């Protein structure tokens, strides 16, 4: 069991009831525990709207560092330097799978792989926060670090530029909220929830946020506009209007096939931009493409947790999934994910929640020949803008 996980009943019993006020309450009010067990261990003066009422930040995901040679991949280094020059962000949100493979997640090697990434943030005086993906800590044993140990290295290397948003009581590591305030104010004007979506479920497939994480969100969210960041996308993305059924493929390949038992089954159609991508639904899979109005690229099927995992007691709160909770509370304006390396779409679903995916920031694993990130501009009126930023050989920048 994760040492950061507490009993759900104990957590809920210890949580304080929020007063009916807008915004998030202060860290000290959220939990009846010592200050060391709350959140917000960072310089809030660095995370503020500027004089124009704007706050700019980047989402960086799936870097998949695999070299211990003390330098970043060329494409990642250039991607960050060009993005820093163009957007001048105050913050980078790292949404998991920053390292991978036995080599770079092993003790001694992890530090060598990570430090060049942190160093480029410090060089440009950009703050950063981190949560984890399925690959960061998939190896276990005395030769590999836990998520918590990795988090501590981010904190150690980042120093004053590390935004320690973590709430230690919650399942996983790298869970919490980064508050963005107006200059001269201590009241958050916009919140960034950065959460650990786990790695792999016990019953197969990917994991999802747990009951205590959802309960905590409902307790602290208030009505302040917010964005949500985690590594693994929620399955609701497939069924809430962002995708439409792909045109039916006809001809010989579409004919019904017979199994060895003589049963009729639908043929497996190859996924692609013409045939669609096989999205998981509660009743099976459907070949789908981006709906009209959804911007960006869909280049692979989404990889959320299984519905049976996502809806079970360990991953719901009072019968509500994470998405149900967002709809109930009403403050989440958008939710952004990594995990699916070549997807970079962005669109509003039928319930008014904006969903986006951000592609891999390196060529270390499968990719489409571009390395990318996502740039955000928050506005003091509770709105925001976002766009993707890419580099590709010969590394000329492009954005859309």
Predicted regions and their residues:
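Active-site neighborhood of phospho(di)ester-bond hydrolases with catalytic His/Asp-centered motifs
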Residues: 59-61, 92-96, 128-134, 228-230, ...
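Active-site-proximal beta-strand elements of phosphoester/diester hydrolases
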Residues: 54-67, 189-199, 229, 354-360
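N-terminal secretory signal peptides and thylakoid transit peptides that target proteins
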Residues: 2-18
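His/acidic metal-ligating clusters that form di-metal
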Residues: 191-194, 205-344
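Active-site environment of divalent metal-dependent phosphoester hydrolases
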Residues: 66-69, 100-103, 130-142, 200-203, ...
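Extended active-site neighborhood of metal-dependent phosphoesterases/phosphodiesterases
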Residues: 31-49, 112-225, 245-262, 266-268, ...
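N-terminal active-site segment of His-dependent metallophosphoesterases
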Residues: 28-111, 116
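Binuclear metal-dependent phosphoesterase catalytic core
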Residues: 31-47, 51, 179-181, 306-309, ...
């Amino acid at each position: 069991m994760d040492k950061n996980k507490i009993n759900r009943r104990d957590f809920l019993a210890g949580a304080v009831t929020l007063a009916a006020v807008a915004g998030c309450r202060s860290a000290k009010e959220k939990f009846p525990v010592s200050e060391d067990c709350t959140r917000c261990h960072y310089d809030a003066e660095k995370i503020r709207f500027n004089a124009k009422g704007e706050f700019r930040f980047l989402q960086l995901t799936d870097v998949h560092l695999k070299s211990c040679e003390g330098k970043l991949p060329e494409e990642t280094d250039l991607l960050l330097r060009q993005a820093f020059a163009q957007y001048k962000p105050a913050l980078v949100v790292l949404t998991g799978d920053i390292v991978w493979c036995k080599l770079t997640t092993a003790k001694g090697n992890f530090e060598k792989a990570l430090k060049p990434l942190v160093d480029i943030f410090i060089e440009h005086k950009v703050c950063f926060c981190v949560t984890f993906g399925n690959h960061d800590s998939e190896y276990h044993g005395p030769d590999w670090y836990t998520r918590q140990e990795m988090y501590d290295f981010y904190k150690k290397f980042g120093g004053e530029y590390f935004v320690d948003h973590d709430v230690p009581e919650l399942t996983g590591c790298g869970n919490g909220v980064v508050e963005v305030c107006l200059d001269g104010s201590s009241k958050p004007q916009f919140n960034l929830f950065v959460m650990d979506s786990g790695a792999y479920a016990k019953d197969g497939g990917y994991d999802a946020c747990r009951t205590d994480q959802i309960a905590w969100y409902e307790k602290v969210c208030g009505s302040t506009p917010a964005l949500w960041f985690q590594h693994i996308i929620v399955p609701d993305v497939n069924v809430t209007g962002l995708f439409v059924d792909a045109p039916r493929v006809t001809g010989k390949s579409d004919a019904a096939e017979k199994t060895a038992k003589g049963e009729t089954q639908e043929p497996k159609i190859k996924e692609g931009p013409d045939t669609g991508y096989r999205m998981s639904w509660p009743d099976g899979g459907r070949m789908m493409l981006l709906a009209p109005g959804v911007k960006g690229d869909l280049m692979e099927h989404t990889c959320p947790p299984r519905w049976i995992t996502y809806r079970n007691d360990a991953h719901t709160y009072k019968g509500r999934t994470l998405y149900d909770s967002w709809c109930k509370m009403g403050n989440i304006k958008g939710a952004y994910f990594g995990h699916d390396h070549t997807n970079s779409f962005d669109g509003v679903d039928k319930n008014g929640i904006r969903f986006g995916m951000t592609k891999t920031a390196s060529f270390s694993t499968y990719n489409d020949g571009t390395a990318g990130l996502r740039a955000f501009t928050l506005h003091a009126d509770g709105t925001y803008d976002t766009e993707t930023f890419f580099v590709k050989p010969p590394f000329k920048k492009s954005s859309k």
